[in-house]
Amino acid sequence: MSTAAQMAAVQARIGQGAVINVDPGQSIGVRSIGQLTVDGTLNAWGGTITLGGVSVQPTVADGVEAKGHDRSIWVDEHAVLDVAARAATAVDSLGRRYGVVGQGGTIVIGGVIDPATGIASAANLFVVVREGARLDASGSQALLDLSGAGPTLVASRGGTISLASNNGLYLDGTFIANSGGAGAAGGSLNVALETPLYLDTAAARVRQARELVVSAADSGAPLPIGSTPEAVAGGLTYGHGRLTANQVSAGGFDNLSLLSNGLISFDGDVSLRLGQSLSLYSGAMALTDSAAKPSQVFLTAPYVRLAGVGNNNSATDSLVRPTVQGGVSTQGTAGLLSVEASNVLDVRDSVNFGAHAERSKALANGIDRRAFDQAHLVSQGDMRFLARSADKTQTALTTQADLNLIAAQIYPATGAVAEVTAGNTGGEFDPARTLRIGRVRSTDPALPYSVFGSLSLNASTIEQGGVLRAPMGSLSLGVDGGITRATKVINLLPGSLTSVSAGGLVLPYGGTVDGVTWRYDGKQVELLGVGGTRSTGNAAGGVQLAGGALKVQRDAI
């Protein structure tokens, strides 16, 4: 059984000039219970390279992690991790070119993100990729003679690079997953900064909020040039993480997933444009303290997912998790957040703009980050509110300021319960803030394949000018909460559609194996009659409008 002394003393090192090769499509794995340093070359073309830690007895690990340390997966400045694809071609007896054009491989440093749960399997080691290091998971191409098409340039997609740590991320190297050529997609970059459970006696150093900062360009490496794992002892900061938009675009990535069990903060003006997908998992999204007040953040992809994190329980009897999950900032709102999906935009779990957390048993230092003054979520197709991934509570999208939701149609997914709140102050709604619903085209799209969902929209002022649907479910606009929390005005604008009708909708919905119990997604279905309520208190079906004033304009349905 490994001891704390072994964790501190054992090292795995691949030195400068060392080269490890495996056959194309095969794997290289290097793990250590202590420090892991790579300054050589690892070649697994079209295969997999994994750098990680080794699990030890929980009683040993808990004590070590509670004290804090500087052990890391350190990818040094001369390191090359190459899983880029190489096409293999030959010529047959008739002079025709044939071959295999495989896609880029996979590099995993520390762990990976599980998109179904919003949890990362991260290492209890810092992840450090020094400037000069190169991680390459690009695709390939080859000229082949295809039957019926003749000479054709065939290209493959880029692979995947995943970096995950429970401690901190220092990402100054080069990450590449280019498309192999025209017609093929770029690869995927996944970056995760997780927050584990610590003993409640843990040192203040480890009980820090995790904050993954996204900036436009590099503001200078936080570690001095020439640093070594030994030289930075005591210099690595728990909760540190930084990634630049330049790194993403220069790497040729078409898919980006970011996870922070705490904050994803934007440092000034940032623009991220992905060719396929963008997924953000966090306790809150906000602006850094150094970001200028008029900062503008633009996030664009065909598919966008905004989600919370799965590991968000704060404590047990003897364990604490120093995480930040939303909260109302004490600072004024600032800047603009614009999120646009050309196909589909999904919202899941608890999505918060702005954050605040006081110093506590779990969190050694309080933290406060500004919410966006204006948030625009736009989908040229559907905007879906999905059921939470881990528990039975509702999905929630919350901001202190104005919120605009614009899509072809907006609806909860099957069985999902979701709530959207603008102007949140922790008490009554901010009377100066508005929740606006809009549409991207004048024609109504076909009914979504969704039933029995529930969606509530809350703000002091609600302007409904879009297409809101919840077939055979419930839609609730406004809150009649008396003096402390009430909607003042609901405006149903011309061309708006607010509907729970399922007329003409045909879709599969579960089944029965015994002729008695009907199940959907493995669970027994609870069907409520008209006017019934769920255990959460939400109406099971129908449209509810609650507010001090209701204004229904011509052509609102």
Features from the language model and the residues they span:
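Extracellular and secretory-pathway beta-repeat/beta-biased strand scaffolds
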Residues: 1-557
